[in-house]
Amino acid sequence: MGRRFLVTVRIQRAGRPLQERVFLVKFVRSRRPRTASCALAFVNMLLRLERILRRGPHRNPGPGDDDGQRSRSSSSAQLRCRFELRGPHYLLPPGARRSAGRLPGHAGGAARVRGSAGCARCLGSPAARLGPRAGTSRHRAIFAFRWVLFVFRWVVFVYRWERRPDRRA
């Protein structure tokens, strides 16, 4: 007695047709308690992976970009630039920040430039911006694919381990 799973991996690359790989994973119930608990943990891991894949992308994205991360208005972009990219809060007194023998802002010292580089993060398309949920669906797909590869390698390892000649009782 045991369980069997059919694991399907779909690989989509740009400019190429969809590739599908199908693996049949069999779990034979073992008499050894440790192996049985490992197999049960592996089955639970597969079921969790299937649940993650079944969820898919978010159903109702917000009014802004495709993943509902932020709104499109330029005023909100300016607010983000002002609050997110604020300069450092100095812990040392001004005398400790001076370079040796010079006063800050005088000729010969490196002047601090706060120009267009300060708001460079807010320019460009919404998908190019950094954020907690930027590119979430792509990250989920990569995570799922890595999980499947890890699981498949683990199954092969356990299968080879169980079939070793010195393990037979």
UniProtKB/Swiss-Prot annotation:
The encoding gene: Cdkn2a
Post-translational modification (record): Ubiquitinated in normal cells by TRIP12 via the ubiquitin fusion degradation (UFD) pathway, a process that mediates ubiquitination at the N-terminus, regardless of the absence of lysine residues. Ubiquitination leads to its proteasomal degradation. In cancer cells, however, TRIP12 is located in a different cell compartment, preventing ubiquitination and degradation.
GO MF, one annotated term: DNA-binding transcription activator activity, RNA polymerase II-specific
Subunit relationships: Does not interact with cyclins, CDK1, CDK2, CDK4, CDK5 or CDK6. Interacts with COMMD1. Binds to BCL6, E2F1, HUWE1, MDM2, MYC, NPM1/B23, TOP1/TOPOI and UBE2I/UBC9. Interacts with TBRG1. Interacts with CDKN2AIP and E4F1. Interacts with CDK5RAP3 and MDM2; form a ternary complex involved in regulation of p53/TP53. Interacts with NOP53; the interaction is direct and promotes ARF nucleoplasmic relocalization and ubiquitin-mediated proteasomal degradation.
Annotated region described as Interaction with CDK5RAP3 and MDM2, given as residue ranges: 1-63
InterPro entries tied to this protein: Tumor_suppres_ARF
The protein, known as: Tumor suppressor ARF
Coiled coil spans: none
Pfam families: P19Arf_N
Phenotypic consequence of residue 120 to T: No effect on activity
Result of altering residue 85 to P/R: No effect on activity
Induction: By progesterone. Induced by activated Ras, and this requires DMTF1. Repressed by non-classical inhibitors of NF-kappa-B signaling such as doxorubicin, daunorubicin and UVC, and by the NF-kappa-B p65 subunit (RELA).
